[in-house]
Structures are given as C-alpha cells and as structure tokens.
Amino acid sequence: MLLTMNLKHYFIAITLCILYILNLMGCKNQQDANEKDLLTIHIEDYENKIIPRPAVISSIDTIALNTCGNFMGDIKTVCISDSMVYVLDRANAVWAFKFPTGDFVKRIRNVGHGNGEYVSAWAMTLGDSLLFLMDFDTKSILAYDAVLNYKSSFRYGFPAMDFIKVKDGFLFLNLLATEKLHRIVHTNNLGEVQQSYLPSKMSLDMIYNETSFVRDKNGEVYIFPPFSNEIYRWTSGGPKPAFRTDFGRNTAKDNVKSSYDITESERAFNTGFFIVDHHIINNFYHSGKTYYSFYNMKDGRQDQGYADTTEVIPFVPRWQSSNGLIGYILTNDYDKWKPQKDSCDAALFVFHLK
C-alpha cells in the first residue's frame, strides 16, 4: 500500500515537472516570436546630411483654411477625416472646414464650466463618426458630431496629455505615472479605468512629444511613450512592441530620468513618430539639431538626415492623416505664401510619401 502511494506521488511530481518545462518552453517560444516580430530600425548615418525632398515626397496637397474673417490663433492640433478638417488653436477655439477645399463650416469657443463647455481644450481625436475633445483642466472628454454640434461628455480621473479612440474605449497618456496607474491608461467609453500599461519613473520634463498615439490607414493604433526607442501596437491584450530604433553609439541610456541627463549626455532621442502607408517616420533630436528618419517597410530603404530648408513649403510635419504627413503655416507670418487669399489665416500641407 505504501509503495503504491509513493509511486502515485512520484508520477504526479513527474507530470507537474513536465508541465512546468512545457510552460517555460511555450513562454520562450512566445518571447522568440515577439522578438522576431519586432522590427529594429538602425539610425546611424544622418549627421550633416540633407534628405532631398524628391527622395521621400511624391506630392503635396495644400489646404488653404478660409477663416471668414474670424481670428485664428497658432494651431495646436489637427484632425482630418474623409470630408472634414478640424483645427484646435491656442486661442481655445475649435474649427471645422470642408476637406479638401478648406471652406469654413463652423467655429466654436464654448469656454466655461457649464454643459457642453470646456476650460482648456488640449487635444482631439476622431472615432465612431464623432470628434472628441480633451479639456485638460477639468479632465473631461466632449463629443461633437461632424459639424461641431455638442453631443455628450464624460470625465476621467487623472491628468492626461494625449488620447485616442479605440474600439472599446480610449487610450490616454497619463502625465503622472505611479505604481498603481502606469503611463498608458485604457478606459471604457465612460472614462472608467480598465487597465494601465508601461510603468515609468521619468520626470515630467522628459515628455517632449505632443502626440503619443497614431492610427494607420488600416485602423491600427500605435503608441509612442515619452522618451522611448520603441513603438507599441495596441491589441486586445494591451500594447505589444512593434518597432524599435537603434542609434548605435549615440543611443541614450535606458536609465535617463530627466531632460538635464539627456542634454548632458549629448545622445540622440526620439521626439515623434508617424506611420503612413508602408513608411515609419520618426523625428529625433541630437546635439542641438532635429533630424528625420524614413524607413520603407516594403523594401527596407532608409533616408536619414535633416530637412531641406531651401524649399518654399517647409517640411515640419506635426500630425498625420490616413494617407500623409501634415504640416502648416500661418500665412500672415510667411512672406513666401502664394497665392495670397482673403480670410486665409493658415494653410495646411499634406505630404504624400513615395
């Protein structure tokens, strides 16, 4: 009887060991698969090099924004849908224009604490046929229809700098990451926290990038955390590493926690990412200069360097649409602007890539 029990325990122990080993192998295989799927972009041949515009840009669309005599402040952010252009300016006004003509549709500046009002408009995103506006001060999201009619709002409980609509709610960039609430926060459609990801201990002055989320033409959402060499793809299971940049000997150390540290190190660090068609574009800062890297995911072609400043239309992309990079000028401050147009305070440029 005793021998039978010992054998039974022995076989149970052997079975558990086998299951444990198989589990470890599965984790290792999954890790290997993730590493294989992670695309590393090597950025080392860029110093003192100009990127010829014809090498990366196929065409440029100009959208002259007709403001109809209304004052437009400096542009803070832009969203473009299939039929509309939305502009948030630093005078706290939200604008709607027709796309691609730039004809004026509506301007709102509903500043206050009442229903449908905001205090400090900060960021915008499109989703579910609505325009969502972030009010930084009140930690609120306001929803509008295509022509800026107010529909609804909700509040979230943490300071955020950027956000984007996803299928089952929103992703936020949390300014004050803690052990309990990490840098990227996933909420439902009512602003209730579902989960948070990507722990971070860096100081606030390390958050250089204005935009931390982009959506490609297929609807995939990508996440660029502040001061990061990695871009993450949003999935039902959370963020998964998708791309990584490697600056070789100029790569900054992982333990940098303040802007002073990175400035003193004179290493390169990313300040923005875009994913348009089959291109990954990142702008980065090194030794007092802003550089760009274009990576073609189809053929592996790379173009690295700084933008040609002799061109009439400046290449300073700030945002992206489904099919191009978006830059802008304030026409009153730009002597090279032609043709001059009445009631056109600003012009957007959509750069289409080769």
Where are these regions (language model features)?
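Short coil/turn segments at the loop-to-beta-strand junctions that recur within blades
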Residues: 69-70, 109-116, 155-161, 200-205, ...
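Conserved blade-ending motifs and adjacent loop-strand segments that build the rim/top face
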Residues: 243-264, 298-322
